[in-house]
């Protein structure tokens, strides 16, 4: 079950499914910017301060907080302390202690994975392109291939994202998503001639089909809860983001 907590008086969203790692989703209280060149210096200072808040909560140095350049792909990388740049990457696998990872979101689906037995984890960024590319299940497969994870030991948190209520798509996107899981008829609806898809539960189904059983799906829609989370669609392509954060204990 998801619940709100705080770090330095700023709201974050956690799940009681993960107890042995630091895993949470930030809110608008901890603003991060996707394109720093689009913002003024005072906002940039706030964003750097917010990154420090995240680092302090994880008890790590700023240089040990790693994040990729997200490009709406299904490319996955394994983090290493001596590698700071992860270009063209939409999922990071974390196997080292004293490192933190975070990815940024505004409507796309954030997925935190944690293997309780191996003490490794990952964060995946699943927009419609990543979802169509099965980034959730591919990240699990990476954990299996590289670290001998077993799906039954993996916990998945599917965080705040645009909901089934609001995510209408065109025919091309619908067709691509419909090929990623079985029984897709339960994951879309036609309303007044428009196609709506359930992106969070498509990712849940992908995880279930690779064997992940313990999955917590956040009920918050980023459009309907725009006071808590950023929404690309609802805020005229805002450059600001909330984040998914993970550190191993």
Task: Give the location of each predicted region.
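Active-site microenvironment for binding and transforming phosphate-containing groups
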Residues: 1-249
């Amino acid at each position: 079950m998801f619940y709100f907590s705080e770090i330095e008086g700023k709201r974050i969203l956690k799940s009681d499914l993960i107890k042995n790692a630091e895993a949470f989703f930030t809110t608008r209280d901890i603003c991060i910017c996707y394109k720093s060149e689009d913002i003024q210096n005072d906002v940039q200072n706030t964003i750097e301060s917010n990154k420090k808040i995240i680092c302090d909560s994880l008890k790590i140095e700023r240089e040990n907080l790693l994040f990729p350049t997200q490009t709406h792909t299904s490319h996955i990388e394994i983090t290493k302390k001596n590698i700071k740049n992860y270009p063209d990457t939409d999922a990071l696998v974390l196997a080292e202690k004293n490192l933190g990872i975070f990815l940024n979101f505004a409507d796309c689906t954030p997925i935190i994975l944690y293997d309780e037995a191996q003490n490794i984890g990952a964060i995946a960024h699943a927009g419609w392109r990543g979802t169509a590319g099965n980034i959730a299940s591919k990240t699990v497969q990476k954990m299996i291939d590289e670290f001998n994870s077993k799906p039954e030991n993996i916990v998945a948190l599917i965080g705040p994202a645009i909901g089934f209520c609001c995510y209408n798509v065109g025919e091309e996107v619908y067709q691509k998503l419909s090929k990623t899981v079985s029984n897709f008829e339960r994951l879309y609806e036609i309303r007044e001639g428009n196609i709506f898809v359930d992106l969070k539960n498509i990712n849940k189904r992908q995880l279930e089909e690779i064997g992940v059983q313990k999955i917590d799906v956040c009920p918050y829609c980023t459009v309907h809860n725009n006071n808590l989370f950023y929404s690309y669609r609802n805020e005229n392509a805002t450059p600001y983001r909330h984040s998914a954060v993970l550190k191993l204990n």
